[in-house]
């Protein structure tokens, strides 16, 4: 597959590591970033520890065009994501007047004042700008450094999604590569994945801009169900669709030759 | 929290990065590893590329006592996890007679023979031993190197879970630390997370063996719902329970003082 600007997602939170929470945020972001034309290269989940966050953000800097962190922006003692980002950037945290105004407004509308724990949410890495939180109290933050756009979003899914759509998407669209991405696929029944393997390989060679992947979901033998997904990138939507269909055609031929059938189609 | 042997989970698969599949395997494994007494330090999702897999397995070696990879063991062209593990170990892949016998048996029971793509599933890193797959065709692999136990499990959840329980758990129990881990919590209504923050901090100071975390799930203001979870480790189950309850007691007191109430309890 051609080189596309890379994106890293860094998910912060012990609850993810101990399996209390399933990381749906990473999948949601991965899908949006892919359709915007970025190549998601890593999702890294780290504990709520400054050094661990700094280590992974530091690895991503200069390597990924976009680095998105989720979680750890709230008012409690272990919300330390922006400390970790600041450490990776070699900068300090600074009270941002615009962010403080966002926090102040959020609480004053509800008849509450500022407390130490609430003011903490307006401490951003030096040089970062706040991202408005349309749903909750904690602003996000975005900063450009060493060729990477580093954006920090909340961990609560409704807040993360709203901030991504309203505040971050416009910034990403400016740096997203031109062109189009499509993803589609078929579900194949009656053929073991291992028998389909040579056809999938052939399909993947249709173009370097096409990525073909099989997902076995039934049993390998007995009642095999294999979903074959194709992701194609091209300069126009029509071209991307055409390449995806060309690749799927190779798989269809295999299904036919092997006596299987197609139970579902998901058009490009 | 006290130092416990660390575990890393390395999830292999483009479908996870592009958000087509939600990484439920990592949560499932994270929960089991935590209850076995390991501290899950990273979950890293990587593409189906040998170099990327090798990079992350290489980082984990010597740092994590246990490294578990999921996915990429199947018969298709992009199932390259064991190549990545071998590269990280500085070893080659080798046809393992025991693994080949597992694959041969799986297919012959179903009246099928071996093909090149099927034999590929028995190519393990030099020195690794196969892990039986009670559900599917591809064996797993386990190898001890540089102080780390590296285990590779399939990506299909039913296969991953069965292999973990039957083949890997006994090996992990041998190296797991003695002692017990409990996790429990309460759901608090009527108090914003930012007001509860000082009490949560106080609870987290009850013992270095206790970890307290709040998860806001309602809105910060209006109808706040905050789940507070406590994870406690100790040498016996009774001690772990006692420490968890002591920490929760601090939070309960805060809820009372702030005029909130507890809507759910999940006993230790």
From Swiss-Prot, chains A, B:
Alphabetical list of SUPFAM superfamilies matching this protein: Molybdenum cofactor biosynthesis proteins (SSF53218)
Pfam family, one: MoCF_biosynth
HAMAP family cross-referenced by the UniProt entry: CinA_A (MF_00226_A)
PANTHER family in the cross-refs: NICOTINAMIDE-NUCLEOTIDE AMIDOHYDROLASE PNCC, NMN AMIDOHYDROLASE-LIKE PROTEIN YFAY
Family listed: Belongs to the CinA family.
Protein name, as recorded: Protein APE_1980.1
Record organism: Aeropyrum pernix (strain ATCC 700893 / DSM 11879 / JCM 9820 / NBRC 100138 / K1)
Phylogenetic classification of the source organism: Archaea, Thermoproteota, Thermoprotei, Desulfurococcales, Desulfurococcaceae
